[in-house]
A protein has these predicted regions:
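Active-site microenvironments that recognize anionic phosphate/pyrophosphate groups
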Residues: 1-221, 225-228, 302-304, 318-322, ...
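Helical scaffold of the NTase/Pol beta-like nucleotidyltransferase catalytic core
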Residues: 192-194, 224-251
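Catalytic or ion-translocation cores adjacent to nucleophile or general acid/base/metal-coordination motifs
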Residues: 234, 243-266, 272-326, 330-333
Length: 494
């Protein structure tokens, strides 16, 4: 039986402050009930060992006794249920967060981030599997990550999810109703998930963390209502309200149009965190001035995408100028630069905005986006083109815009295979899974001599170079003299 593992889990919960000593009997009985056990044999002492090992032992026991199905989704649903038993109620979490916030906003977020890891909502051991590195490019050190922390569903679980009754509750994975939700085969369990209410622009929003943590303290700021993404004047006000309350965090919004937006357009939300991206480090390459806003520092950023940076001590001035730029961009057409505000009544122009505090001033980066498609570029003219799809095909959302490539899990094995083939001189086209990389590999062989010692490092740098190209493709005004001239034409039109 798994009594020792239950005792170890109780010991973990006590050490991390999830429960107190007076909760022990209640918590052990709740765990026994979940494990379908009717009695308790006290192992006397808890062993201190990794949470992943404790949960694995409990899952193996539950599967062996047919308490759960032995597939990845069922296991995730069940270990979340176990951790949910040990997770304090929302009222306790909110009270503790607010108490710490009164002393220091950073102390509050430090505590909440650690808490979300201790509850296993953020699975540290899975996040640790992600492959991460930086790559030097003309635009600075770009961050590259191959995301391995999102669980991949096995075929049995996919089939079971299709057969399960369909429900629209919660409406999406960002809705506040996820807090405490037991989950189902096609929706993750969230019993150990907690959110903190905040007010921005006099609206009820919530702060939580991403369970997949693409960067340090990767937080999500979500609307209390299931309402679609929208970039407007109120968006700029909300972003600046957030950094006013949490000045150590940046926050940004995905764009509100398909192709250039993120993966979730149905629920209004922002993403932020305690991290400095390459785009934030990028300097202003040309100072510009907007009429009637001479008090606002403005410039074009040295970045592969088209970025206007605004700085001012008065946040309301930034809101007003950002709104003017947005309105101008929404209606802007420059046929010579292949920029069209709309075609056949479909709008194409929008903005990806990012806000931060820097040296006591408010700062807004406005990234100009356009989602027009053509026969030659059916996925988007300002989207990674076909020749880069072997590395990155997905939308270029907020995180990528700022200089962090979130690459698919398939690349872990594929890049290992490419490295082996380059060292041995194997034909990549003979391997179905690696053939997509063959043209790229041919180019690399011209530039480098690959050995067993250097292949991995060289490939990592070359993946970074591909990501820089991805961002160049997504940039509306290119980093060429002609591109900068067309960029200035837009600036002068504002």
């Amino acid at each position: 039986m798994c009594y020792q593992a239950i005792e170890d889990l109780l010991g973990y919960a006590l050490r991390t402050g999830l429960i107190e000593e007076c909760d022990r009997t209640w918590a052990s009985n709740a765990l026994l009930q979940a494990m379908k056990l009717e009695s308790w044999e006290d192992p006397q002492t808890a062993r201190e060992r990794p949470l992943e090992d404790i949960l694995r032992e409990l899952l193996e026991d539950a599967a062996a006794r047919s308490v759960i199905q032995n597939d990845a989704v069922s296991r995730d649903l069940f270990d979340t249920e176990l951790m949910g038993i040990l997770t304090p109620r929302p009222s306790q979490v909110i009270s503790e967060f607010r108490r710490r916030y009164q002393a220091d906003p950073k102390e509050a977020t430090d505590w909440f981030y650690r808490f979300c890891q201790d509850t296993d909502y953020i699975r540290r051991y899975r996040v640790a599997r992600d492959r991460k590195w930086t790559a030097a490019t003309p635009y600075g050190e770009l961050d590259i990550t191959i995301n391995l922390s999102k669980p991949e569903k096995d075929p049995k679980a996919i089939a079971a999810a299709k057969a399960a009754p369909q429900t629209s509750y919660p409406k999406c994975q960002l809705c506040r109703e996820n807090e405490g939700y037991a989950g189902r085969l096609n929706h993750p369990a969230r019993q150990n998930h907690r959110i903190v209410p905040i007010t921005i622009n006099q609206e009820d929003w919530f702060l939580q963390y991403s369970p997949y943590v693409y960067y340090n303290e990767h937080c999500i700021v979500l609307n209390g209502h299931h309402t679609p993404m929208k970039i407007d004047k109120a968006t700029f006000r909300k972003l600046l309200d957030f950094v006013k309350q949490f000045p150590h965090y940046f926050v940004g919004s995905n764009a509100d149009l398909p192709i250039v937006g993120g993966s979730i357009l149905s629920h209004d939300h922002f993403q932020g965190g305690h991290y400095t991206f390459a785009m934030e480090k990028a300097p202003v390459e040309r100072t510009i001035t907007f009429r009637d806003f001479e008090d606002v520092e403005a410039g074009i950023v040295k970045w592969p995408m088209s970025v206007i940076r605004l700085r001012c001590e008065d946040d309301q001035r930034l809101v007003e100028l950002a709104d003017r730029i947005l309105a101008a961009w929404r209606g802007y057409t420059d046929k010579a630069a292949f920029v069209f505000a709309e075609t056949d009544g479909e709008p194409h122009n929008t903005i990806t905005p990012i806000a931060r505090m820097r040296e006591g001033q408010f700062e807004l980066d406005l990234v100009l986006r356009n989602n027009i498609t053509t026969e030659e570029y059916p996925l988007g003219v300002y989207h990674p083109h076909q020749e880069l799809h072997h590395i990155k095909k997905e939308n270029i959302g907020l995180i990528e815009v700022m200089g962090l490539a979130v690459l698919p899990a398939r690349l872990k094995d594929e890049l290992n295979g490419v490295a082996r083939a380059l060292v041995r001189g194997d034909d990549l086209r003979a391997d179905e899974t690696l053939a997509k990389h063959a043209d790229w590999a041919e180019e690399l062989k011209i530039r480098h001599v690959f050995t067993a010692e250097n292949a991995e490092d060289l490939l990592r740098q070359e993946v970074g170079a591909v990501f820089a190209q991805v961002l160049e493709h997504a940039g509306v005004f290119k980093c060429t003299p002609e591109g900068r001239e067309t960029f200035l034409r837009f600036v002068q039109s504002v």
